[in-house]
Amino acid sequence: MAHKFLIKKNKAGEFVAYFVYNSETIFWTEGYASKASAKNAIESIKKNGPEAEIDDQTD
């Protein structure tokens, strides 16, 4: 599989969820105090992301 979510700890000791595609980080979340919160963030992205609109503010 070329894409996946990773959970890592940042320098502050917080749990951060990363979305990685072909070994390249595409985006990451804020830091969370618990691993469970980072997992909840991943589930929210998976559930709500496919229906998210694109808001192009470049024009």
UniProtKB/Swiss-Prot annotation:
SUPFAM superfamilies: YegP-like (SSF160113). Pfam families: DUF1508 (PF07411). Belongs to the UPF0339 family. This is UPF0339 protein CC_2965. It comes from Caulobacter vibrioides (strain ATCC 19089 / CIP 103742 / CB 15) (Caulobacter crescentus).
